[in-house]
């Protein structure tokens, strides 16, 4: 049985954006996007969806440790957050006079890049 090959999703959320979680156990939290995973349609957000991992000692004499790190969230569970207006909004793509594409928040009209 053949499995479906993963497809790259065009994401409107980028690294460095401030986002708010809109679903799940961390609903309402905000943070900066550290990494996007377009092949999985997921994002890693700073301080959100934390997981603890036990790391074995790499060398003899070194002790093992417990590491807390961010796990990825599905991109549909986050919205871009305006820090000025304190509101989460969807993103639309607008084309300016020169033909360049820009991202704009639908609720506030704020340009992202």
UniProtKB/Swiss-Prot annotation:
GO biological process assignments: translation
Alphabetized GO MF terms: rRNA binding; structural constituent of ribosome
Gene3D superfamilies recorded: 2.30.30.30
InterPro entries to which the protein is assigned, alphabetical: KOW, Rib_uL2_dom2, Ribosomal_uL24, Ribosomal_uL24_CS, Ribosomal_uL24_KOW, Translation_prot_SH3-like_sf
Keyword Ribosomal protein carried by entry: yes
Pfam families: KOW (PF00467), ribosomal_L24 (PF17136)
Family matches, as SMART domains: KOW (SM00739)
GO cellular-component term (any): ribonucleoprotein complex
PROSITE patterns to which the protein is assigned, alphabetical: RIBOSOMAL_L24
Keywords noted in UniProt: Ribonucleoprotein, Ribosomal protein, RNA-binding, rRNA-binding
Similarity annotation: Belongs to the universal ribosomal protein uL24 family.
Description of how the protein assembles with itself and partners: Part of the 50S ribosomal subunit.
Its job: One of two assembly initiator proteins, it binds directly to the 5'-end of the 23S rRNA, where it nucleates assembly of the 50S subunit. One of the proteins that surrounds the polypeptide exit tunnel on the outside of the subunit.
NCBIfam families, sorted: rplX_bact
Protein name according to UniProt: Large ribosomal subunit protein uL24
